[in-house]
Amino acid sequence: MWVAWSARTAALALLLGALHGAPTRGQEYDYYGWQAEPLHGRSYSKPPQCLDIPADLPLCHTVGYKRMRLPNLLEHESLAEVKQQASSWLPLLAKRCHSDTQVFLCSLFAPVCLDRPIYPCRSLCEAARAGCAPLMEAYGFPWPEMLHCHKFPLDNDLCIAVQFGHLPATAPPVTKICAQCEMEHSADGLMEQMCSSDFVVKMRIKEIKIDNGDRKLIGAQKKKKLLKAGPLKRKDTKKLVLHMKNGASCPCPQLDNLTGSFLVMGRKVEGQLLLTAVYRWDKKNKEMKFAVKFMFSYPCSLYYPFFYGAAEPH
């Protein structure tokens, strides 16, 4: 794994080295017929500066270069702001939905320190979006406006192109199990999921239906226990229907047998209840019992949830 990562780092370093001798931004992007979108007319109190990528910026600390430029390409002026916003993307990076996710995100959050900003190529954005957008959608998050790929230049020698997309993913391997069915086995892991879910319910499942590429979990009328109600209203719980986005064709071992009770978590998005995690209820599981008992005293992160989701206003 170390050899593969070294090769990747070397490839990125060669690319960035070549960019040092590049023409100015205005000359180059005029030539390619692309202009960076204005930063909303925002004026900055400080001139651009370069600084080391700190160890407590884990999204980008291992990206392959050591120094970054501020303000970055997302208009963050301070390192504190970068850390706050970047931390919410760590869960997506951990999912390994595309080999170039880190390169793409860090080209925006922690752009390499050169005399002019270097943007990601449109193809890099499109590759990352193709790999990661379906996973984000499964948790109720659309691909964000700030990452729309039309904002970035068509491929040329002076933007950051796809680096590692042709290489196999490194461990942990990409799983074919539905994202909502990947299980945490520790109490802390379960409580993190509970933190980032709008609601948590112990319930029985009457049946499962397939609808436009999604699974619909139809709850039994009785035997429901709201452990975390969140935005759920009486009409939601009376006939509980959970949508498992993009879950029609991927396996979910927990749902192979619908006997017994389930611990389910989810988010309410535009009136629809989206399933984010499902476990078979096991009263002998000490980690699960601990998580359910102490979920409200767990110190949930403020900024962790862009991907798994701080609940949106309802």
Swiss-Prot record:
Domain FZ: 45-162
Keyword Phosphoprotein: no
Gene Ontology annotations of biological process type: cell differentiation; convergent extension involved in axis elongation; digestive tract morphogenesis; negative regulation of Wnt signaling pathway; post-anal tail morphogenesis; regulation of establishment of planar polarity; Wnt signaling pathway
One Gene Ontology cellular component: extracellular region
Keywords from the UniProt entry: Developmental protein, Differentiation, Disulfide bond, Secreted, Signal, Wnt signaling pathway
Family: Belongs to the secreted frizzled-related protein (sFRP) family.
Annotated domain remarks: The FZ domain is involved in binding with Wnt ligands.
Official protein name in the record: Secreted frizzled-related protein 5
Organism whose genome encodes this protein: Mus musculus
Name of the gene this protein is made from: Sfrp5
